[in-house]
Amino acid sequence: MSLQLSMFAPKSEWVPPHELPDLSNCKQIAIDVETRDPNIKTKGPGWPTGDGMIVGYAIATENWAHYIPIKHVGGGNLDELIVNRWLKKVFESPADKIMHNAQYDAGWIRQSGFTLNGKLIDTMVIAALLDENRFSYSLNALSYDYLNKTKSEKELNEAASAFGIDPKAEMWKMPAMFVGPYATDDAKLTLDLWNYFSVQINKQGLSKIAELELNLLPCLIDMTWKG
């Protein structure tokens, strides 16, 4: 299936990174994956069974952030072999790996053949420790409430409307240039949230509980993987 570029689609100046930097000295790396997960609403996430695929990776560090598309049906992808060689180094580095809903992202990364080293941190888990009575723990809601920031969804939604597709469930069909800014924001906001939350954890005396919760994440992923 291939989408024709709609004459009504908004203009986008976004392009994927021209080169992939050396992140070996980074202490924290935020990661978000964009996926094709066709049966998530009926069968749950597809990563334990390989039902779907990652179409792109958003990576954010203190000094660099970008979206790296590899399998968008609409085009604009980077060479997957080159990207995978770089990602292997990133994922296997000792840096803390920060995600929002880490079981999903880390699960898909595992399904894609990578090993994640370093401490796994989930900002969704930490948010629940800090405030167990919230209505929403979505990345956008948390970012708005704690950071006064939100994701840039306008261009994504306008493009999806022009193509006649669902901006979230069918994001994989779109040209990467319309997904790039949105996906990059996912990773950047996740990193910003963790930088804020890490201070609040110490202030509220929750460090030991947070450590316990985060240490459970790899076990939960293993259990889901093995069924």
Give the predicted meaning of each segment.
Residues 1-41, 83:
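N-terminal accessory regions of nucleic-acid-interacting proteins
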Residues 42-44, 94, 167, 208, ...:
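Sparse, context-dependent recognition of short Cys/His-centered cofactor- or disulfide-binding micro-motifs
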